[in-house]
Regions:
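Active-site loop/helix belt of alpha/beta enzymes
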Residues: 1-56
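C-terminal accessory subdomain/extension
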Residues: 73-183
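General structural feature for long, well-ordered alpha-helical segments within catalytic domains
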Residues: 3, 30-33, 64, 124, ...
Length: 183
């Protein structure tokens, strides 16, 4: 509001006062005079917002459904069909309190798999590792064809990769939402 007041005092009309960012949208105490709030990832939240305390894990609403397509057992890798074309190359959590690699791995139902992260991303393939957790038989735990969900570091960068979203409502019905293109 201070900038708008200074602009107006200089004799320039300033009808629109716009603020941005998800943390601002959630913490603002007084929006008097603000005509627009651009809340960023507010609708979905993401791992960056989770790391700074803006949201809880159960509030993360965007995920990418992926399929296990292979393994490199000697390296401890689970290979999926969701690479950086699906997830983006955003490593926004790498300097935060918890680094999620390229994304947090969950079961198809959305339950976190502790220690499982997307640690590598090629164009079409993601590489999941289980961190320090020792699993003798990755192929048995995550067989080819099994599906997982990946929670993104940055919902904007990931969401922009897709022309539409499949939204699940409280009753379990799936709806398709078309994405608006452009900023």
């Amino acid at each position: 509001m201070h900038a708008a007041e200074r602009i107006r005092k200089a004799g320039i009309a300033c009808a629109d006062v716009s603020i941005g960012s998800t943390p601002t949208a959630l913490s603002a105490q007084n929006l008097d005079g603000v005509t627009e709030v651009r809340a960023g990832v507010y609708v979905f939240f993401d791992l960056v917002m989770h790391n700074i305390g803006v949201c809880q894990t159960e509030e993360l609403a965007l995920s990418v459904l992926t399929t296990v397509i292979g393994h490199q057992l000697a390296k401890g890798w689970i290979i999926t069909d969701a690479g950086w074309m699906a997830m983006s190359r955003d490593r926004g959590t790498q300097r935060q309190r918890h680094d999620f690699g390229y994304g947090q791995v969950c079961s198809e139902a959305g339950d976190w798999i502790d220690g499982a992260r997307v640690t590598g991303a090629n164009q079409e393939h993601g590489i999941i590792t289980l961190g320090d957790t020792c699993h003798a038989d990755l192929a048995a735990l995550f067989p080819i064809g099994s599906r997982l969900r990946i929670l993104p570091n940055h919902a904007c960068a990931t969401g922009a990769q897709f022309p539409h979203y499949h939204a699940l409502d409280a009753n379990g019905a799936v709806h398709t939402w078309s994405r608006l293109h452009g900023w």
